[in-house]
Amino acid sequence: TADGGELFRNNCAMCHNFAGQGGALTQGKYAPTLMGVEPKHIYEAMITGPQSMPVFSDKVVTPEEKLSIIKWIKAAESEPNLGGAALGRVGPVTEGLLGWVLGLGMLIGVAVWLAMKAK
């Protein structure tokens, strides 16, 4: 699966993000998540290139490499998220930002409530 991870990062991560969670593309397009998708559908998508996805012919990515990518996706799918709230496995920056936004929102709410109570 290490080879599959490298192949995924080189061929797929720019659209589906490094964790296979999908994401926004240009011109309002979207790359779907690969988590929870049947392996045969992932393989078919690689050879047909649906929507704005490129076609990965056998000359570009061999069938063995395609299967290695799928194996890596399935292994990543079953890994526990040790970082807390998943948030698309974007990482600690997003999780920290969410904490700050919620915390500041609560502080503003308390300040408004105290100001209203003082009147």
List the predicted regions and their residue ranges.
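Extracytoplasmic electron-transfer domains, predominantly the class I c-type cytochrome c fold
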Residues: 17-19, 24-81
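Sequence/structural segment immediately N-terminal to covalent heme-attachment motifs in c-type
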Residues: 1-19
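C-terminal capping alpha-helices of c-type cytochrome domains
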Residues: 58-117
